[in-house]
């Protein structure tokens, strides 16, 4: 019997990277950063401030997570630190417990709640601190080497060899200095320097060229190079040298930098020494000189051994460091004003140490950093993938414009660490990636991937999983997981393809060192959910991976007939399903509540999430999947989410699909669907929109929420309660009032009779205007929730809401059925737009009368090379008839040639025999069936491929995109209609569209589009009047954009004027009355008229 390598589920939580990093921040990162900061000494040396961080305290957030979300607040804990202030002259000590800022807390779903919005901190992958040797080749083919020492904090140091074999040293890529001057400035004698080198004669050339010098001369030269404007001085030179490379507060190699330096140069320096030592510098130089003699290796900067991941904890630590630097300056300023006398009087230290700089830094990071993103909550998979994302962008990383192809490319060291498939399609291709399923971060932030040890062809599973980093892996011969093994865990076969030193080679099985633990470990989570992935082209697999994240959760979730086995873990690790905490018996189950009685008799109550709005307006709700009296285990799923089915990820529906053309309706990836999908709510989804209004104190008085709205009939107020707020459960259409609100109107200049009436009858109430919140046009739905916050009742509201007295939030749920224009896709990148919904009687049908659900174009398969959809479709067809579901791990060719095809044929034959439906499988046309036209009842000429495909409805819904405009707002400068649905904009008639009308010869249509339908202000008003009065539309005038062009040319000091030719005499010209400035005639116009009268007719005018 043969079996595969162990393909059990991933051995750890998929969100471990986020959780572990945040935990590290509180246990180590925070303490380390403030210990480096403490003590702060007054510049006069009189006072000293100590921070005792090991005794820090975190106070629980004021509000629960749910309350903070409703009030648009940040879910954060308050940090308090014991502080000690010492007077160094008198020895008096004062202690206090100081508030040190609010630190946002990670929720159990690994997100942060910032101002009521869930956000995710994504992981940044950056060049690791350490040492990098590189080679440069000039046009003549001369090779020169250089070395860069990258620190975690502080200046970059570089040594380079020029084509004359002289060694130079650079600081921060600018200041250049002969290398031996730098060494002499470090107080090293010539004998010490030369004895440390393997080839001392190479450096002697540099010393001979520039001349020897003493330590003092070297320091003077060092100062001259770094501060060219100042008089050179050896004392200042020594201070500059110390502060640049040997002051722990200014220069820090970091834990990782020291590790990389020790590893590359075989040093044994303590990990706690994080500054450069003279031993480091001599070894760095020795290695550089050895490269000139062909000894040693240069470094590949794109290798993952030289790139590390900064997860959330480290990013927070960097941000805290910026805040502490600002705080230090503040403390110095406050200490400079402190005297011994005022110190004795001071009871509290709170005025001395203000948490504002730290708070501002953290707010800035969480609110506006490139690495803090609005969480993608479209479905559970999108949420999970967002937290496992890696980016090269962000502070300290690269920018989109500077990133070349080398950075974006797939590197051999990415194997098992960064997914080669999942990346965005646009500008960010290759810059944003995703961690693979089994990837894991080590203590230094390098990505590791798991393997089993192999001894003499036997897999040593009993030794457990061994994690290797990219540079460790290069030393071994590593086999992929898709090899066959027998029951004794011995690899079958003689010659096996392995990876060795970033190349693929063939080797004997007894020479294999390690084997991958799963074929899925090369890919990210969403790519691992694609069945038959090995049969898809990578470009289409990329689209399939990305589109699964855009799938809208449906009303009735259905798990796929054909999956990969990862669906359960993705659903569980996304934290969107409800997981049982303790073994016991289900005591009570309702729609929103589950009660479990544990074996000890204790009751655990779980409250389900019901109809909550996600960041993308999709619906988050939980459904119980256990029943009363059922025995449940710890870790068992108790309730499903909107996009899970029995605890498995369920993003779409299994549909009966036929690959055939149908009357041209599925041309260019269009899709035909059966009306059954509409009537039976197969693809119906729920979307929840939020609308908000607030009452404010204006100059003219306070706004008021009321039912008494001027000039509004009773029918428009039908859904409002006595307060003027819409009732929960009401059905609302576009234009309906959600919240009745009035604002005071300014008193207009009253006519004399008005003043007389006022004088007789006294002060009358001022007019109010209608400022009600209304439903936008084209929208409809049912009110599911109304929330009111009133300041008088002490409701804490979000920052910035200080001027609001009342805030009303309305949540409206919409049921969106599938319709023409919606986008659908499979898991293999096969996407399309619905072009027609056919009556079920018109759909092609099977020999047993079953109508097809969806018709796809067969031409979408061959050129796209995503044949996986064909395999999935046929295996799903077999699964349907056998009453089973299949879980397949990709790369099954290890079982033999054409393994997928053979397996599917076997299953189809089995289904045929089990159901006695002989038409299910025909060996002459395997996978194809004779279909009949629903309109005529006749069979089609050729057999057609029919099967069960798993299709998703994507978030690009036509309801959100379709838009029409009759009249609307115009741009202030160009006077053209605005663009976009949100601005009630028009359709852009661009350059190419103009060409199309020109080619067609539609002159009048084109003129109307460019003038009265766009920016001819006078013309469009006249046209509207003419349409209203039923008269002929007048001829268009001059578009505003022409006037803008004229003004721009005049701004360049070009006296450009437009003329029109009169209808009478062709030779006579007069200035065209274009009012550019608001006045009819300008001085320049009068001058031109005089010139025209004086000059001879037909003579060319020059201005």
From Swiss-Prot:
The keyword Cell membrane does not apply. PROSITE patterns: RNA_POL_BETA. It comes from the Eukaryota. It catalyses: RNA(n) + a ribonucleoside 5'-triphosphate = RNA(n+1) + diphosphate. Pfam families: RNA_pol_Rpb2_1, RNA_pol_Rpb2_2, RNA_pol_Rpb2_3, RNA_pol_Rpb2_45, RNA_pol_Rpb2_6, RNA_pol_Rpb2_7. Its EC number is 2.7.7.6. One of its GO terms (molecular function) is ribonucleoside binding. InterPro entries: DNA-dir_RNA_pol_bsu_ext_1_sf (IPR042107), DNA-dir_RNA_pol_bsu_external_1 (IPR019462), DNA-dir_RNA_pol_su2 (IPR015712), DNA-dir_RNAP_su2_dom (IPR007120), DNA-dir_RNAP_su2_hyb_sf (IPR037033), RNA_pol_bsu_bac (IPR010243), RNA_pol_bsu_CS (IPR007121), RNA_pol_bsu_protrusion (IPR007644). Coiled coil: none annotated. SUPFAM superfamilies: beta and beta-prime subunits of DNA dependent RNA-polymerase. It is found in: Plastid, Cyanelle. GO terms for biological process: DNA-templated transcription. GO terms for cellular component: cyanelle; DNA-directed RNA polymerase complex; mitochondrion. Transmembrane segments: none annotated. Keywords: Cyanelle, DNA-directed RNA polymerase, Nucleotidyltransferase, Plastid, Transcription, Transferase. DNA-dependent RNA polymerase catalyzes the transcription of DNA into RNA using the four ribonucleoside triphosphates as substrates. In plastids the minimal PEP RNA polymerase catalytic core is composed of four subunits: alpha, beta, beta', and beta''. When a (nuclear-encoded) sigma factor is associated with the core the holoenzyme is formed, which can initiate transcription. Belongs to the RNA polymerase beta chain family. This is DNA-directed RNA polymerase subunit beta. It comes from Cyanophora paradoxa. The lineage of its organism: Eukaryota, Glaucocystophyceae, Cyanophoraceae, Cyanophora. The gene is rpoB.
């Amino acid at each position: 019997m043969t079996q595969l390598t162990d393909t059990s589920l991933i051995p750890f939580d998929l969100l471990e990277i986020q959780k572990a990093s945040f935990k590290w921040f509180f246990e180590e990162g925070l303490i380390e950063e403030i210990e480096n900061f403490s003590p702060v000494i007054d510049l006069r040396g009189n006072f000293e401030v100590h921070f005792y961080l090991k005794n820090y305290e975190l106070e629980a957030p004021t509000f629960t997570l749910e309350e903070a979300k409703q009030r648009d607040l940040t879910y954060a804990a308050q940090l308090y630190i014991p502080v000690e202030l010492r007077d160094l002259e008198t020895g008096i000590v004062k202690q206090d417990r100081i508030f040190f800022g609010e630190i946002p807390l990670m929720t159990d779903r690994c997100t942060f709640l910032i101002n009521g919005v869930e956000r995710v901190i994504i992981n940044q992958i950056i060049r690791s601190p350490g040492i990098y040797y590189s080679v440069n080749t000039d046009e003549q083919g001369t090779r020169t080497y250089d070395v860069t020492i990258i620190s975690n904090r502080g200046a970059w140091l570089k040594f380079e060899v020029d084509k004359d074999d002289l060694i130079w040293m650079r600081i921060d890529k600018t200041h250049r200095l002969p290398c031996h001057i730098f060494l002499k400035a470090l107080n090293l004698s010539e004998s010490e320097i030369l004895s440390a080198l393997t080839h001392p004669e190479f450096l002697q050339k540099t010393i001979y060229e520039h001349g020897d010098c003493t330590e003092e001369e070297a320091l003077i030269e060092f100062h001259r190079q770094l501060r060219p404007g100042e008089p050179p001085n050896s004392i200042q030179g020594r201070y500059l040298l110390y502060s640049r490379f040997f002051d722990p507060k200014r220069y820090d190699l970091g834990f990782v930098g020291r590790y990389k330096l020790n590893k590359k140069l075989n040093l044994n320096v303590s990990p706690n020494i994080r500054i450069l030592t003279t031993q480091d510098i001599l070894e760095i130089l020795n290695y550089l000189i050895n490269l000139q003699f062909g000894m040693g290796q240069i470094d590949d900067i794109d290798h993952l051994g030289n790139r590390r991941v900064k997860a959330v904890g480290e990013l927070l630590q960097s941000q805290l460091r910026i805040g502490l630097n600002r705080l230090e300056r503040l403390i110095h300023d406050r200490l400079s004003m402190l005297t011994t006398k005022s110190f004795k009087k001071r009871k509290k230290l709170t005025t001395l140490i203000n948490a504002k700089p730290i708070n501002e830094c953290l707010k800035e990071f969480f609110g506006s950093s490139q690495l803090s993103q609005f969480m993608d909550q479209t479905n559970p998979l999108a949420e999970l993938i967002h937290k496992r994302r890696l980016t090269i962008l962000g502070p300290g990383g690269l920018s989109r414009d500077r990133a070349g192809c080398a950075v974006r490319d797939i590197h051999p060291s990415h194997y098992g660490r960064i997914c080669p498939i999942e990346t965005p399609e646009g500008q960010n291709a290759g810059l944003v990636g995703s961690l693979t399923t089994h990837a894991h971060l080590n203590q230094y932030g390098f990505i590791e991937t798991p393997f089993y040890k192999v001894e003499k062809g036997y897999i040593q599973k009993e030794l457990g999983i061994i994690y290797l980093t990219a540079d460790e892996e290069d030393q071994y011969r590593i086999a992929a997981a898709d090899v066959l093994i027998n029951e004794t865990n011995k690899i079958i076969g003689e010659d096996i393809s392995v990876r060795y030193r970033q190349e693929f080679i063939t080797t004997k099985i007894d020479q294999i060192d390690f084997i991958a633990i799963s074929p899925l470990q090369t890919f990210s989570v969403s790519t691992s959910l694609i069945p038959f992935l090995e049969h898809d082209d990578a470009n289409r697999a990329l689209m399939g991976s990305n589109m699964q994240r855009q799938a809208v959760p449906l009303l009735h979730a259905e798990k796929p007939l054909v999956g990969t086995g990862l669906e359960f873990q993705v659903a569980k690790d996304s934290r969107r399903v409800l997981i049982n905490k303790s073994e016991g018996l289900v005591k009570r189950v309702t729609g929103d509540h589950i009660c479990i009685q544990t074996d000890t008799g204790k009751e655990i109550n779980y409250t389900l999430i019901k109809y909550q709005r996600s960041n993308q307006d999709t619906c988050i709700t939980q459904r119980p999947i256990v029943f009363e009296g059922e025995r449940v285990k710890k870790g068992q799923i108790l309730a499903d989410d909107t996009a899970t089915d029995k605890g498995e990820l369920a993003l779409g529906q299994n549909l009966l699909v036929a690959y055939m053309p149908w009357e041209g309706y599925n041309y260019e990836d269009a899709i035909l669907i059966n009306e059954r999908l509409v009537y039976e709510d197969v693809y119906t989804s729920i979307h929840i929109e939020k609308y908000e209004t607030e009452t404010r104190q204006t100059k003219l008085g306070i706004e008021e929420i009321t039912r008494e709205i001027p000039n509004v009939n009773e029918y428009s107020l039908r859904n409002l309660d006595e307060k003027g707020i819409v009732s929960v459960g009401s059905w609302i259409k576009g234009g309906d009032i959600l919240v009745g609100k009035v604002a005071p109107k300014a008193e207009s200049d009253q006519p004399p009779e008005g003043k007389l009436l006022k004088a007789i009858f006294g002060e009358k109430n001022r007019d109010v205007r209608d400022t009600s919140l209304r439903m936008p046009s084209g929208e409809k739905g049912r009110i599911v929730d109304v929330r009111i916050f009133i300041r008088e009742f002490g409701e804490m509201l979000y920052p910035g809401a200080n001027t609001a007295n009342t805030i009303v939030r309305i949540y409206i749920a919409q049921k969106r059925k599938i319709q023409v224009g919606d986008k659908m896709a499979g898991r293999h990148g096969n996407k399309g737009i619905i072009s027609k919904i056919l009556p079920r009687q018109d759909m092609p049908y099977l020999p047993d009368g079953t109508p097809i659900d969806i018709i796809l174009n067969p031409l979408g398969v061959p050129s796209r090379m995503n044949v996986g959809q064909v395999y999935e479709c046929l295996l799903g067809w077999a699964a349907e008839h056998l009453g089973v579901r299949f879980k397949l791990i990709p790369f099954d060719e290890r079982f033999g040639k054409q393994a997928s095809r053979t397996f599917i044929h076997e299953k189809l034959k089995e289904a045929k025999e089990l159901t006695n439906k002989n038409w299910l499988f025909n060996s002459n046309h395997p996978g194809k069936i004779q279909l009949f036209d629903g309109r005529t009842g006749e069979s089609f000429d050729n057999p057609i491929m029919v099967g069960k495909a798993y299709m998703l409805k994507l978030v690009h819904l036509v309801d959100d995109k379709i838009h029409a405009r009759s009249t609307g707002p115009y741009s202030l400068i160009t006077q053209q209609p605005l663009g976009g649905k949100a601005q009630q904009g028009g359709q852009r008639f661009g350059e190419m569209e103009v060409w199309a009308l020109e080619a067609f010869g539609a002159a009048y249509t084109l003129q109307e589009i460019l003038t009265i339908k766009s920016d001819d202000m006078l013309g469009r008003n006249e046209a509207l009047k003419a349409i209203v009065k039923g008269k002929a539309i007048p001829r268009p005038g001059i578009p505003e954009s022409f006037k803008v062009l004229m003004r721009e040319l005049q701004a360049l000091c070009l006296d450009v004027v437009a003329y029109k030719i009169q209808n009478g005499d062709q030779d006579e010209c007069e200035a065209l009355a274009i009012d550019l400035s608001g006045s009819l005639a300008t001085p320049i116009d009068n001058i031109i008229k005089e010139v025209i009268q004086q000059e001879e007719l037909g003579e060319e005018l020059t201005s």
